[in-house]
Amino acid sequence: KEKKLKPTPYIPQDIEPVSDSDSEFKYLEGKTIKFLGNIKSSLIAYIKWLAKTYNFEADITSDYDKITNLDFRKFRYSDKYAAIIAGPMPHSVKGKGDYSSGLEMLKNEPGYPDVVECVTSEKLKVTRTSINKALQEVNYKLMSR
């Protein structure tokens, strides 16, 4: 009688442990981070898990139409958000003025929270790794204040 082997559970290789001292995210605690961009539902779940684990609030807008109709000017001079983490999004959004995109306006106009882009291979792309890197950058900026 042949013995059947139990399948080993799948462990994704692309997940980097968030355990080294740089990525403790302790300066995010109690803060609200705005996530804007095309974000897959599995990554939204990951962001929510990070928020719960590291005690920060994640305000996520990932729907293309909602981003297009979101007036980015509402983020100006608002102390609601500690930072904005941006992924790929439509160029044309409400309130972008003469800028080529809402993201350009957020990065260049005074009075907006820090904007950190989720970048993979020099392109805006939301992945677990780019989320972790963006949160590390936000954590560092908050620590430096």
Predicted regions and their residues:
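Alpha-helix C-terminal capping/helix-to-coil transition sites in glycosyltransferase folds
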Residues: Y77-D79
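Short, surface-exposed connector motifs at secondary-structure boundaries
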Residues: E29-T32, I85, Y112-D114
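Ser/Thr/Gly-rich flexible loops in soluble cytosolic domains mediating phosphotransfer, phosphorylation
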Residues: S101-R145
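Phosphate-binding glycine-rich loops and adjacent basic patches that engage nucleotide phosphates
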Residues: P7-I11, S62-L70, S92-S100
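Short acidic, S/G/P-rich loop/turn micro-motifs used as interaction or catalytic elements
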Residues: I39-L43, D65-I67, A86-K94, E122-K125
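Extended, charge-rich low-complexity interaction segments
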Residues: A82-M105
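Short N-terminal or domain-adjacent regulatory/targeting segments
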Residues: K1-Y27
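Redox- and metal-dependent alpha/beta enzyme cores, enriched for Fe-S-associated oxidoreductases
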Residues: S21-F75
